[in-house]
Design a protein with these regions (language model features):
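SAM-dependent transferase fold signal centered on methyltransferase-like domains
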Residues: 1-195, 206, 235-242, 310-316, ...
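Rossmann-like S-adenosyl-L-methionine
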Residues: 2-6, 158-160, 164-331
Length: 331
């Protein structure tokens, strides 16, 4: 039992108080679930029965998407990590307890390569420097890894040698993408991209479907829990194969494509054009023909459907953090 405890409950994160990303860090996982259950009950119990939370067997090192901001400390050493709560000061992070271990190894290697290749990190105050962020996405089932290098200009000095050196240390990397963000903004990714190695995207499997994931695509960061979440959503929808389903805020089409085998037809709507492109390609790659995807605002799209007299039987909705459109209250 003592050995099992060591495996499932690592030491408390050393930067948790500065980072602010894990507010319950140091609290035993079972206690975290109890606290969260109380919060959910308080919010939703007036609407119906609240089922018990389904927790993870091992709630560590699960994130398949890892971001690191780069800067220099007071001594001029290159550091990488996350922003301190409510600031843009970089908190150096060597080991995050919820981020994929391999991705963290790659970030540490990149930090060393910046020093070897004499590449300057970007300074947000002065706008001077080149290297801003690294974004890594890993397919937990496919094993494919995408590394996105975010720069303040479109040119990475000695880019071929840089990529070769990176892949020499981590041959598992299947694609490297250069993203250009030359604006003074808190956004991580810019609009322009250039593929330095590989196809510029990765694939992963979820609930039996294969998904193409680009640098800007939304894809759930916890693949283990996502499968449970989607399966439960489809179960609670009581689909019989006769229903017309709408997947609002569909992203790259994950929920809609997985639900398509249980429904008559599925319509997905998403504002992000890159995500819609991936969703259409995902439908083709999975040979799913009863799904259509549209680019647009989910609320406006469904409002227009209602005005035309079109109806759907089931709505799946996974909105962004800001929440769903106010128009949905009227539909």
């Amino acid at each position: 039992m003592e050995e099992k405890k060591k495996q499932t409950e690592p030491e408390a994160c050393k930067v948790a108080k500065k980072c602010g990303g894990c507010q319950y860090q140091g609290v035993p996982y079972k206690e975290q679930l109890k606290k969260k259950q109380k919060m959910v009950n308080a919010l939703l119990s007036k609407y119906g029965k609240v089922e018990p939370i389904i927790g993870m067997e091992n709630p560590y090192y699960y994130r398949n998407k890892v971001h690191a901001a780069f800067d220099r400390d007071r001594k001029g050493n290159i550091v990488s990590g996350t922003y301190e709560t409510k600031t843009h000061r970089v908190v150096p992070v060597e080991n995050c307890l919820i981020e994929d271990k391999k991705s963290q190894e790659i970030i540490r290697t990149i930090r060393g390569l910046l020093k070897s290749f004499k590449i300057k990190t970007y300074d947000e105050d002065t706008g001077y420097g080149l290297f801003r962020h690294v974004l890594i996405r890993r397919g937990f089932k496919s094993g494919e890894i995408m590394v996105v290098l975010v720069l303040g200009s479109p040119i990475l000095p000695s880019s071929n040698n840089f990529v070769k050196a990176l892949r020499k240390e981590h041959p598992e990397i299947t694609t490297v993408v250069l993203n250009i963000n030359d604006r003074k903004t808190s956004m991580i990714l810019g609009e322009r991209e250039k593929v330095l190695y590989g196809k510029g995207f990765i694939r992963d499997e979820l609930c039996g479907c294969t998904f193409r994931i680009s640098p800007k695509s939304f894809y759930q960061v916890n693949p283990v829990q996502t499968e449970i979440l989607y399966q439960k959503a489809i179960e609670f929808a009581h689909l019989t194969g006769k229903e017309s389903v709408i997947d609002a805020y569909c992203g790259i089409g994950t929920i809609g494509l997985i639900a398509s085998g249980h429904a008559k037809e599925v319509v997905g709507v998403e504002l992000n054009k890159d995500a819609v492109k991936d969703a259409i390609l995902n439908a083709k790659e999975n040979q799913i023909r009863n799904v259509r995807f549209f680019q647009g605002d989910a609320g406006e799209f469904m409002e227009a459907m209602a005005a035309e007299g079109n109806s759907m039987d089931v709505l799946f909705m996974d909105p962004p953090r800001a929440g769903s459109d106010e128009k949905l209250k009227m539909i």
